[in-house]
Amino acid sequence: MSLNDAYAHCDTLLKEQDYDRWLACLFLPASARKHAHALYAFSSEIARVRESVREALPGEIRLQYWRDVLNAESSDNPVAAALLETVKSFRLPLAPLQNLIDARVADLYDDGFANQNDLEGYCGETCSVLFQLVAIVAGGEANSLSKAAGHAGVAYAMAGLLSILPVHQARGQCYLPENHLKSHGLAREDIGKPESVKQLRAILLDMAQLARDHLQKAQSAVAALPPDVRPAFLPLALVHKKLESIIKNPDPARILSTVAGWRKILALWLASTRT
């Protein structure tokens, strides 16, 4: 498979598995787009490991495969081949990608988070890193991106986690910090019980407001970046309405409905005109 075919595969995979990010990539410079596809496709493959296995061990083996990929010179896997070429072309650091893989190990064991800092750290290692690397691909300087990428990743990841709470519950997962549950008199096993709805609504509201705070800080930091780099942060344009919907109605039994594609494109376009 040629590199062009590998990048085309990443394009197709991302469109199927992470449509929001795929749409956001349309607003990147053409020279950066395929590299963003490779980074996001890699992340998507790592995130899907938990869904594709029934036990932790096969998942560990799959994650180890991707660790080995990062240390390889080449690969027959199209996502891996495109990723390695992107890393090489932009001299991207491997440590953040390795940390992303390591952070996803917790998903295999359905580990929760003791506190808010742990949750924010997970969001940073699985999502902030993507904002950072895509921004570098778009021409940003690594040492100027930390604040924007850090807050952006936490806001984006938390909004995603909060919007599908029932899905996680069905899998036996919980991404709500244990100390927040305890402060409202709940334990992890209480999630889903009718008598816990009032407390869970309060927790969801708190977490959505926290994510909104990160979003506002991210937007301020992005505004200070060079205009050519700001499109790397366009996925944030899809976060605001999601968080406002949760804040307006923090229903723990609700999965946020999918927004029509044209509305997403409009939101991204409007955001792109302000960059």
Label every model-predicted segment.
Residues V105-D118, K193, V197:
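Acidic/His metal-coordination segments adjacent to aromatic residues that form catalytic metal sites
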Residues A138-G139, S163:
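A broad structural signal for alpha-helix termini and local helix breaks/kinks
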Residues L133-V137:
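Alpha-helical transmembrane segments of multipass membrane proteins
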Residues M1-T86, P93, L97-R104, C123-Q132, ...:
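Catalytic cores of Mg2+-dependent Asp-rich isoprenoid enzymes
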Residues G140-S144:
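Helix-coil boundary and interhelical linker segments in multi-pass alpha-helical membrane proteins
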